[in-house]
């Protein structure tokens, strides 16, 4: 497949804080990824927003850092059940991901094989580049949506346009991190931005 054949647009989506709600971890006092299936809660407006993107011809690709197993916080089986719970809720609304990409590693992990540096953890664009090659996606016509600076850096490194959800316009979030092309309050607003922009 030549570069000229890459014409399909995609929306690459972070998971926690974008599609489903973050959960308060009482041990750390921080809002984190859900550690139990019952804690998975799809954010309001997300299913119809994703359906609009899907109907407009965008491939939906989930790209998420999920280091809780590497950090010893949960089992691989639990991570799988959490994903299945989320997928089941979205399938009820006819939402289908072209690919689901989870990085299970962490630089400070405690489990062999999942600790240390890896090629796939965001901000690395590795998953986006793989999806481009496997599905013939045009990254220049695609978008990355996330709530963290690493999501925005990932998208920019891959050559997509970027939207930060839940951030203040013009604020990058961390010193030295890139500013998103757009900053909005929710996935619903992010979809309005995408569908209002011409294919470039």
Question: Where are the language model's segments positioned?
Answer:
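Hydrophobic "anchor" residues on beta-strands that sit immediately upstream
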Residues: 10-12, 61, 143, 182
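Metal-dependent phosphoesterase signature
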Residues: 19-43, 66-78, 92-93, 111, ...
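Substrate-recognition element of Asp-dependent hydrolases with the DxDx(T/V) motif
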Residues: 46, 50-89, 95-109, 155
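Structural recognition of alpha->loop->beta junctions
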Residues: 83-102, 174-195
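Conserved Lys-Pro-Asp/Glu-containing loop-to-beta segment of HAD-superfamily phosphomonoesterases
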Residues: 119-152
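Short, hydrophobic alpha-helical segments
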Residues: 135-137, 191-200
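Acidic, Mg2+-coordinating phosphoryl-transfer loop and its flanking beta/alpha structural elements
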Residues: 140-185
């Amino acid at each position: 497949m030549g570069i000229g054949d890459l014409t399909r647009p995609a929306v690459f989506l972070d998971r926690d804080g974008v599609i489903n709600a973050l959960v308060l971890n009482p041990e750390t006092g921080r809002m984190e990824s859900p550690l139990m299936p019952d804690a998975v809660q799809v954010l309001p407006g997300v299913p119809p927003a994703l359906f609009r993107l899907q109907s407009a011809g965008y491939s939906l690709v989930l790209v998420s850092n999920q280091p809780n197993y590497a950090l010893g916080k949960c089992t691989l089986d639990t991570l799988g059940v959490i994903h299945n719970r989320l997928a089941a809720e979205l399938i009820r609304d006819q939402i289908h991901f072209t690919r689901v990409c989870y990085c299970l590693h962490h630089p400070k992990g405690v489990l062999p094989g999942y600790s240390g540096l890896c090629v796939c953890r965001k901000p690395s664009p590795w998953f986006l580049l793989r999806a481009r090659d496997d599905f013939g996606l045009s990254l220049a016509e695609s978008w990355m949506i996330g709530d963290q600076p690493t999501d925005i850096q990932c998208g920019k490194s891959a050559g997509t346009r970027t939207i930060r959800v839940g951030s203040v316009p013009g604020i990058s979030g961390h010193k030295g991190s890139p500013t998103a092309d757009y900053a909005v309050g929710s996935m619903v607003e992010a979809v309005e931005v995408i569908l209002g922009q011409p294919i470039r």
